[in-house]
């Protein structure tokens, strides 16, 4: 039916002249996307009105997959092919995740980043994360009505270079232009600071599903300065789940190794539900029937849970104390503590934070959404949509020192941790032997003094150094960190001018060949994806047209005679019956038939509206 949809002036959620950019919180447990609409940052919901997308991907045979809620619901029945908490594996080698608590996956021993074998082939954490990011990108484009110019994606402040590079690789694979990687606590501060006009020293306590960050920020007249950052990239809400999981098993006299993978996933799901219930109730039940027929039924009290997880709570306070020392402030100097991450809903966490800082934490912003909202504000700025009064300066820091290996396997730090980014620092080195014409440069990241205790980021060689006596050559090594926290290294021999450089892409990141292969794989499933999208679009349009036609019949059904009304009713019935089906062509045909069958009805309604508007008015008044 030829019905026009007209918005009031200025009421469009995103005016066409704006460049559409979003903020994405790629979380361990849940992910979400937000955008600035009508000058207000808001999280974008899916078709069912749900803002949070579970960070879960299930791979099916023959290239199919389920993402988000559907995958989460099927995790217990197919645990080996359903990847959860993939963020914990980003930028990590097999040796670093082999002991991942109760993970039912088959990890593949491959160079660089760990990979997981599924029924659809071997998948890297980057590929899994890309599925989640692509889903959020599609949600944003559907909601905002146009393509995105880019996204600000948040990462834990304590993510190292390898993990940050892996995140950018995933975004690239998902078809997203990354405007910036933004530290999660900093994003939260942007959302909180701009929303409340806050000034002073603030601590951002960020406990997500898989990572913990503590940042000390100074907010002064639109300047967001990160004074210090600390944390643990292997500590999060999942660890609280696993402690309670082990407790329930111990009480039942069972061991995780003896359980079937589907029972492990089912029990973990029930335990997580009990943990969440304890945030609002003094006790919760865990009731599970295992595949063996055995039943587990236990009552967990809030006090029992608090005692059980106390060691994990204390683990968060270690980086907190360290960050305060680095910032040269005390807990008493902190004006407010912002909580970020769903895990901060636990009373045991809120009580510990309140006790340590001597004040109740700030909880007026949704801890699940605040990071994405801050990222959306930053994305809107970077996209060029800033309006008067929106000026602010963001001064972030690197979480770990960057250095170079020197003789004896020692580390010489070039850029110390908590340096404000972007930053460039240089230092001069010399040759060790007479006649030395080349120098191997090994880039490392970490706080330890020995190379063996730090993370290796890259190696390259500077060749063509003129032969000189040992100590005569002057090699200037420059480290440059961009706003995303990613590193480039340049080396130059001062006498001859020979130079070499490397953009650090860690061994745990992806090479261009890997990206190309993954893109090729995505092309193979593109046809399936497009068919699914076409079907969904056809169903939505059919539903819209049915509802619009029925509303028009209620309002102006008297404009049709009995025969015409019967024809329209039949077309509506036909389309309503086809709409839930999976034949997009049939739905499109029925939609077209109803639209054409109501053209005359639409024209009569238009005539009626015009006559009503002109009734009683003279020609010179029109």
Curated annotation (Swiss-Prot):
Keywords: ATP-binding, Chaperone, Nucleotide-binding
Species whose genome carries this gene: Burkholderia pseudomallei (strain 1710b)
GO MF: ATP binding; ATP hydrolysis activity; ATP-dependent protein folding chaperone; unfolded protein binding
Name the record gives this protein: Chaperone protein HscA homolog
Domain of life: Bacteria
Gene3D superfamilies: 1.20.1270.10, 3.30.420.40, Actin, Chain A, domain 4, Substrate Binding Domain Of DNAk, Chain A, domain 1
Residue ranges of the TM segments: none
Tagged with keyword Transit peptide: no
General function of this protein: Chaperone involved in the maturation of iron-sulfur cluster-containing proteins. Has a low intrinsic ATPase activity which is markedly stimulated by HscB.
SUPFAM superfamilies assigned: Actin-like ATPase domain (SSF53067), Heat shock protein 70kD (HSP70), C-terminal subdomain (SSF100934), Heat shock protein 70kD (HSP70), peptide-binding domain (SSF100920)
Similarity comment: family membership: Belongs to the heat shock protein 70 family.
Protein's gene: hscA
Pfam families: HSP70 (PF00012)
GO process annotations (BP): iron-sulfur cluster assembly
InterPro entries, sorted: ATPase_NBD (IPR043129), Heat_shock_70_CS (IPR018181), HSP70_C_sf (IPR029048), HSP70_peptide-bd_sf (IPR029047), Hsp_70_fam (IPR013126), ISC_FeS_clus_asmbl_HscA (IPR010236)
Signal peptide coordinates: none
